[in-house]
């Protein structure tokens, strides 16, 4: 069955700004009615000094009939080839450097490399509560923002060609703490998120023959007009929504949208067979898609 989802994460913000992220059973972001209720209830609890909160020992949690372990990692990794042409990546021998920026994808990238036999290196597998491995963002704060050239400085430096024009990876990628955002680094530097979304859209809609013929391109109102021109060039309807990935959820579920993306380096798209993959942003598939594009188009 379906369940609600809760993630405690700072996302791409400073670690001290850890937040409570709620996803209803459809998997996408919650609407404002739900988030407003959660915020109101949380503030009520805080005002009372936690006295109304029941406490349970961690050792007793798994004894509760409503709590059990689930192997999200294996479940996710085993299905990746349904949304990404991983065979093409492996056969082309694309060398990938994946930096989880100390976030939730750290174990996923290693499992992906092993499961599919990819030339993939987890650039920084370190998990450090002090975030000592992070370069500071533009304002001097630690921020796991994979779309920031400051936060991605280490990966950008690693991809700088040597005197012979060589780099350790053909493509490098980063994810934020909860891995719903992506950053793509080539020897030329960190790609502009809007530019990569435009490339991804053009590629997907011309290399997914089993997608519905009427599936549209989804973008937020503040995303680049480049996407409008790409949608027009490939003969696909463009659907503009207000800022917020939650507005893409119905279209992704029904496959009326083949792709939904927002300017802040977050997107998702359909499986290869044209059915829904994720109703929230998935930074891992967007990162792997860059390697697929390189493998297929050179």
Where are these regions (language model features)?
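Ferredoxin-reductase
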Residues: 1-28
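Conserved active-site and cofactor/substrate-binding residues in soluble primary-metabolism enzymes
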Residues: 29, 33-37, 71-75, 103-108, ...
């Amino acid at each position: 069955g379906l369940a609600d989802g809760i993630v405690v994460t700072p996302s791409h913000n400073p670690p001290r700004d850890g937040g409570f992220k709620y996803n209803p059973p459809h998997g996408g972001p919650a609407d404002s009615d739900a988030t407003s209720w959660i915020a109101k209830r949380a503030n009520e609890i805080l005002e009372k000094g936690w006295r109304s909160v029941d406490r349970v020992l961690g050792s007793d949690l798994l004894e509760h009939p409503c709590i059990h372990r689930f192997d999200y990692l294996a479940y996710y990794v085993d299905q990746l080839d349904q949304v990404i042409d991983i065979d093409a990546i492996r056969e082309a021998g694309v060398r990938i450097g994946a930096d989880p920026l100390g976030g939730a994808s750290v174990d996923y990238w290693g499992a992906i490399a092993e499961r599919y036999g990819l030339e993939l290196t987890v650039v920084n597998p370190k998990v450090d509560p002090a975030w000592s491995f992070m370069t500071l963002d533009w304002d001097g704060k630690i921020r796991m923002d994979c779309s920031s050239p400051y936060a991605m400085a280490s990966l950008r430096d690693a991809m700088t060609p040597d005197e012979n024009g060589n780099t350790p990876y053909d493509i490098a990628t980063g994810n934020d703490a909860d891995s719903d955002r992506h950053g793509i680094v080539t020897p030329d530097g960190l790609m502009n998120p809007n530019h990569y979304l435009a490339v991804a859209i053009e590629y997907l809609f011309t290399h997914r023959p089993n997608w519905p013929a009427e599936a549209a391109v989804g973008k937020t109102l503040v995303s680049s007009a480049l996407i409008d021109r790409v949608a027009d060039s490939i003969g696909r309807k463009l659907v503009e929504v207000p800022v917020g990935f939650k507005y893409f959820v119905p279209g992704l579920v029904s496959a009326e949208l083949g792709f939904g993306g927002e300017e802040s380096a977050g997107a998702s798209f359909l499986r290869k067979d044209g059915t829904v993959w994720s109703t929230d942003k998935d930074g891992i598939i967007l990162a792997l898609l860059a390697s697929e594009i390189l493998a297929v188009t050179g």
